[in-house]
A protein has these predicted regions:
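N-terminal carbohydrate-binding accessory modules
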Residues: 1-23, 38
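Aromatic-lined carbohydrate-binding surfaces of glycoside hydrolases
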Residues: 24-176
């Protein structure tokens, strides 16, 4: 954005990016009131028109992506996610989900691996293009934390159909 001295009409606030150099998108990954499906759709459609090419669904309020990550989404929520993924694809936007496998790094044994693989199958069925494993906002008091998180990311990458796998570590700044 450029500093402007005169009011600018809203339609001129979004500059058209060069798709050759920038991969713009939105990460819906914040605390607070989540968007409604209508708000989410309107935002995605508007930003698709401005050259944004991915949408990562990861609201902190979606308990089935955080503390209750092992549980599948209820049918109504899963249907809404599926419709949104289809709409993203129809608008040329890659669809992704940010999963925060709460406390899974503490015991990444057979049971947890099976739960993660099962969850990834459910998410893949939505037409997942992007998968993000989000370890931010979690405890990080283990000397093996980075090793476990890397192990989980590798496992997820091997068990998803998503073409891109991203991660956000517990510590991503100088101070924990």
């Amino acid at each position: 954005m450029h500093a402007l001295s005169t009011p600018t009409p809203p339609e001129r606030l979004v500059e058209q990016p060069s798709t050759e150099t920038v991969d713009l998108g939105i990460v819906e990954g914040y605390f607070g009131r989540p968007w409604s499906w209508a708000e989410r759709e309107a935002t995605m459609v508007f930003l698709a028109g401005a050259g944004y090419r991915f949408f990562l669904y990861a609201p902190k309020a979606d308990v089935h992506l955080r503390r209750r990550w092992r549980e599948p989404h209820p049918d109504a929520e899963l249907s809404a996610l599926r419709r949104f993924a289809e709409s993203c694809h129809a608008h040329g936007v890659r669809f992704g989900v940010g999963l925060s496998p709460f406390e899974a790094w503490r015991d990444f044994g057979s049971e947890t691996r099976q739960a993660l693989a099962s969850r990834l199958r459910e998410l893949d069925a939505l037409g997942l293009d992007l998968l993000a494993l989000l370890f931010d906002d979690m405890r990080g008091d283990s000397p093996e934390l980075a090793v476990r998180q890397a192990e989980m990311v590798g496992f997820a990458a091997a068990h998803t159909h998503a073409t891109q796998v991203w991660m956000c570590p517990t510590y991503y700044a100088d101070a924990p």
